[in-house]
Amino acid sequence: LDVMSHVTSQPLLRTYVIYDSKWFKNYGKVVTDSLVKYIIPIDYSIGLIMISYTDGEYCRKMMKHIEEGTQLEAIYESLKEIFPDDKIEKRPKYLRNEYWETGAVYWNRGADSEKMSKFMMKPSKSHNLFICGDSFSENQAWTDGAIYNAREVSKLIN
């Protein structure tokens, strides 16, 4: 079974900022269709927020802004569209990007993910080889996919 031809890896980018104003104090996690994609507050008391969590196409767009030196402007414009009534600082006092070229793995269209996920847990009948993690799970790119997969593999081992 050629599982590797049925998955594709995508880049992942998380952008963290600290704002003095804490303008986001009344919001929880926000999911958008804008450039920033996901907005996840981390510590309201110090103004820390994951202002952008992107993968794939959105990640590549954001990386282009980073390369061109326009990331902060692009983020600010996205935020003003999402939160038009909030007073958002144009420049946070802190910014950090975390990039992974192979950040997430996804099943390709047409892949029998259930069958392949089960197969990958123990891909060899003649060797004690076990594979677990989110990459070949039914819930890829999320910790709970890895945890579920690890539990299923542990049942095979015991």
Regions found by a protein language model. Give the residues of each.
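Conserved flavin/dinucleotide-binding core of flavoenzymes
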Residues: 11, 27-29, 33-158
